[in-house]
Amino acid sequence: MTPLKPSDLVLTPTHLRFLGRRFPCARGRCGLTKAKREGDGATPRGVHRVVGMLYRPDRVAPPANWAVPIGPSDLWSDDPGHEDYNQMVRAPYPHGHERLRRADPLYDLVLITDWNWPRAVRGHGSAIFVHQWRKPRHPTEGCVALRRDHLHWIAERLTPGARLVVR
């Protein structure tokens, strides 16, 4: 692996490090794994790239000029048996998915990683995002989650392709 840079998002057991700052965070309820599987509740180890940023335009301003608004019909396919697995799709969509436009604020701002993307291996996990946490350090289904203001601070300074390092 190439040496770490201050612009890398580095996940440690207790925090996420970025630009010399440490942010408390949450990770998968089942810890970290090198062998990620759909629904296992683990955060995949490795070096991932941030390949997209989504935001709810009815709730927050775009934090960066490359952020894309989440529309009412936007979904993320989590059906390993379908060709759109681990891709953003639109309703109506009859296969397994999760809504990106949620009633709660968890996906008001989302950083999309390249875990198992763009050519997904079926069953190897989907929707590995960096998003707002439910409550302090409350485990996720495999994503990395942060306090709302910390997530926005990071998003305002992040560049496309930044690395998320999970060790």
Q: Could you tell me what each predicted segment is?
A:
Residues 1-140, 149-163, 167:
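Cell wall/extracellular polymer interaction/catalysis modules
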Residues 143:
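Short cysteine clusters
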Residues 146:
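A conserved hydrophobic position in a structured secondary element of the catalytic/binding core
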